[in-house]
């Protein structure tokens, strides 16, 4: 999202608007896959801004057009078949791959940033529950309510650590409340 923010925002935000419009025309319920990056403020990167705007679009379609929408904010999902590399890899997947490859665990910044890690099975259970209700643009957080520092997580994996520069726009803390 940092490399080409205009293209990214156009794709993500307009894509969400089109899905909302399709839900309106088909009189369907919409469960929006949000992100913990939209929680709190300020929006520190294009991804977070697009996810927050998506939630706002869903709420507007509920209030103006009567579409049943609900947004689910995912908090650092991990579990089976998680990506271990590329732009969608999470720190758990990256650490898993680095451990299997006997590589040092790369930690951005000082490692004291904190994350609420949520297993994919809990996300699925939350989405199923949300899909069964009627909503008016509400936002629900799908997380554990407990967070750990990246250093704590690295300690669970064990092994050598390598600290690299912090990434721009990275939130200091995520925690579902």
Q: Positions of the model-derived regions?
A:
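Short glycine/proline-enriched coil/turn segments at helix->beta-strand junctions
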Residues: 24-28, 40, 135-136, 155-161
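Residue-level signal for the nucleotide or nucleotide-sugar donor/cofactor binding architecture
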Residues: 3, 11-14, 45, 86-90, ...
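C-terminal "lid/loop" region of Rossmann-like NAD(P)-dependent oxidoreductases
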Residues: 110, 139-140, 148-155, 159-176
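Hydrophobic "lid"/C-terminal helical patch
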Residues: 127-131, 154-157
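Hydrophobic alpha-helix immediately C-terminal to the catalytic Tyr-X-X-X-Lys motif of short-chain
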Residues: 53, 57-61, 91, 95, ...
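Glycine/proline-rich active-site loop of Rossmann-fold NAD(P)-dependent oxidoreductases
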Residues: 52, 77-93, 101-108, 112, ...
């Amino acid at each position: 999202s940092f490399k080409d923010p205009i293209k990214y925002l156009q794709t993500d935000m307009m894509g969400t608007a089109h899905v909302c419009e399709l839900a309106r025309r088909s009189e369907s319920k919409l469960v929006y896959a949000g992100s913990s990056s939209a929680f709190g403020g300020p929006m520190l990167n294009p991804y977070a801004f697009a996810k927050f705007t998506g939630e706002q679009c869903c709420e507007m379609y509920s209030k103006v057009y009567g579409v049943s929408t609900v947004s689910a904010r995912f908090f650092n999902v991990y579990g089976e078949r998680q990506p271990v590399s590329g732009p969608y890899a999470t720190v758990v997947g990256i650490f898993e791959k680095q451990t299997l490859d006997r590589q040092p665990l790369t930690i951005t910044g000082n490692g004291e940033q904190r994350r609420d890690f949520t297993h994919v099975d809990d996300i699925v259970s939350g989405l199923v529950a949300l899909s069964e209700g009627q909503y008016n643009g509400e936002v629900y957080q799908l997380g554990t309510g407990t967070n750990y520092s990246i250093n704590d997580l690295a300690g669970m994996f064990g092994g050598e650590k390598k600290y690299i520069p912090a990434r721009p726009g990275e939130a200091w803390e995520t925690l579902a409340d």
